[in-house]
């Protein structure tokens, strides 16, 4: 049985990361295993920024967003010498295994450490839901709720002034936040990463709505895919459609806030599952949610998986949300 494990959060923060930390600490404690938190992700691993965690410390973080341990990006971790320093720090502290919470980039580091003798388990922590080997990532539900609430508020004011609004949403190349928000808010026009509309197409569709007498429009777009700002997209749509068109960039508000009950549940139980696997002497695994059940897969296999093709659903939803009658 292992005696000490470490835990770190890497990449962009996501609501629910603290619940995963709590799940690891409480489960490990029940098995007599000590847990050390690594501050600021892989950077803390290389610099030896370790702190001993206990159950009492986790009680105050269950309802908090962000990550108690802090997070930082370290591209240099792909270099062997940097990883060797990290492994030396772990061995010096007597840490035999590691739980890594983050996205795809974090898992590559975890796989390399496993190959160097430190068993690692990866948990999917990102609001983007861009990891193919899990139905939902930790943080996705909370971010979605935050976005939907914001779009509902935007709808109120657009309706009052007969305007359209272009809402830019995060996703890191994955359109799930856009598509799910379109379902939840009835957005008339939406352009997720998987099936982008051109600005001309969005403008012409908006023009059709205006000619039918629709008072307001919500237009959702995935971030960083048009090469211009949301304000510039709005200006172009306004010229084509005739709607007075505003732009809203939700930005980092999507990452913050208290995690929803579902994110807390997914994160905590994933942390429990990770400790159980490490206690069995297993490593190089990724914990994902599949059909409402936690599963463990080899990290290598998860990195090559492709997400389900959502284009048929997106096209069907466009027809439904795009229909308007008085």
From Swiss-Prot:
UniProt-listed SUPFAM superfamilies: Phosphofructokinase
Activity regulation as described: Allosterically activated by ADP and other diphosphonucleosides, and allosterically inhibited by phosphoenolpyruvate.
Keyword Ribosomal protein belongs to the record: no
Major subcellular site: cytoplasm
Residues binding Mg(2+): 104
Active-site residues from the entry: 128 (proton acceptor)
Biological process terms in GO annotation: canonical glycolysis; fructose 1,6-bisphosphate metabolic process; fructose 6-phosphate metabolic process
GO cellular component: 6-phosphofructokinase complex
Chain segments annotated as coiled-coil in the UniProt record: none
EC number: 2.7.1.11
Key words of the record: Allosteric enzyme, ATP-binding, Cytoplasm, Glycolysis, Kinase, Magnesium, Metal-binding, Nucleotide-binding, Transferase
HAMAP family cross-referenced by the UniProt entry: Phosphofructokinase_I_B1 (MF_00339)
Record note on quaternary structure: Homotetramer.
Similarity annotation: Belongs to the phosphofructokinase type A (PFKA) family. ATP-dependent PFK group I subfamily. Prokaryotic clade 'B1' sub-subfamily.
Protein name per its UniProtKB record: ATP-dependent 6-phosphofructokinase
Species assigned in the record: Mycoplasma capricolum subsp. capricolum (strain California kid / ATCC 27343 / NCTC 10154)
Top-level taxonomy: Bacteria, Bacillati, Mycoplasmatota, Mollicutes, Mycoplasmataceae
